[in-house]
């Protein structure tokens, strides 16, 4: 292909300087005023590359051996002058180099005058050349055509339709713009079809039939809904009945908790400090603890971490003291009741000599969660062990963390808030009626359960407490005794 254009190139340059034209010869053309400025541009044989690309293309080495007048595009000064002249006035030829002479109509190469050479009307069919989206690319015409087969005004300095020279321009066939569409290039030759396939164009989205890949709509049968039995609506309970049911469930839960505490602590009359996790069955022991520096340091730690005021901390201390007084009163009442003692279960019930069991006194270590025999040697051996030294430090930090949680939970209780308001007014907030006392007990036991659930994730028994898992009986926990734990009936 390039060889033929190379031989024709010499002929066109000779005719450029020798041939003359007249107005009569150009009178038959509809756009004859453009005739004198048209000339076959040798640049079309380069392959239609962009003028701003390198001068050496894919087929330049072949053109240099077969009749091409110029070894390089910009070496000959005469060629450069011709290129500059045609680039300013005409813009070069718009013939596509991908079409060989065998595909061109008869008479094109014959010297029949300027009229047949310059008119593009016979070549404006969409079956001859593919429509282009952008021009001046590889294999593309130098400038787009208009509706009548001639060149567009863009080639002669007219207004541009796209952004920049020769970009974003669309072909027009018959005066109708068809953006993104190209002619039927299936009838073109192999080279032309290859060029047309490289043209960017909008592709229509593939048609997806409904129901092939998507979900099919479930069709319900007319009589299917009639066979289904509709469950009867649940009876709506009144607010009083719902409240009564919740109260009964809460009391049953409290009863089970009291039984569990009774099995754990014996008579359930242990004196506890919820902040320090201190437990004692002696009144004197709890009194000494409440007045000790350990208890005061714990209150200072809570105030420092929670930023509570001094009256708040005094109120929390009074709550612990009030709990101690309640426990002492219930304990005195239970000791006076002989019937309660008769109903007390015997610890050794069902134990026979063959079981080889005996009742002994033990010492419980809350830091290690182990039971140590109540012997001097056993207690001293446990105190000097490495496990106890590690566990007591970790347990102390755990108590500090849980004390903050306990204090915050107590103050968030609505009943405690009401008592705190009375305390600020100078009244005694702990004198309550029997009904209020029952409600207080329910609130306190609910709070106890929440605190125990919150303290479970913070207990670390993996490495620091290896003996606790093996020695502590299942279900026992002496480390979480909230402020409001009571055993009132």
Curated annotation (Swiss-Prot):
GO terms for molecular function: DNA binding; RNA polymerase II complex binding; zinc ion binding. A motif (Bipartite nuclear localization signal) lies at residues 200-221. InterPro entries: AKAP95 (IPR007071), ZF_C2H2_AKAP95 (IPR034736). The keyword Metal-binding applies. Residues 1-28, 62-100, 133-181, 205-263, 431-489 are annotated as: Disordered. Residues 62-76 have a biased composition (Basic and acidic residues). Residues 433-451 have a biased composition (Acidic residues). Residues 7-22, 91-100 have a biased composition (Polar residues). Keywords: DNA-binding, Metal-binding, mRNA processing, mRNA splicing, Nucleus, Repeat, Zinc, Zinc-finger. Its main location: nucleus. GO terms for biological process: embryonic body morphogenesis; mRNA processing; regulation of DNA-templated transcription elongation; regulation of RNA splicing; RNA splicing. It is found in: Nucleus. A zinc finger (C2H2 AKAP95-type) spans 273-295, 365-388. One of its GO terms (cellular component) is nucleus. Component of the DBIRD complex. This is DBIRD complex subunit ZNF326. It comes from Xenopus tropicalis.
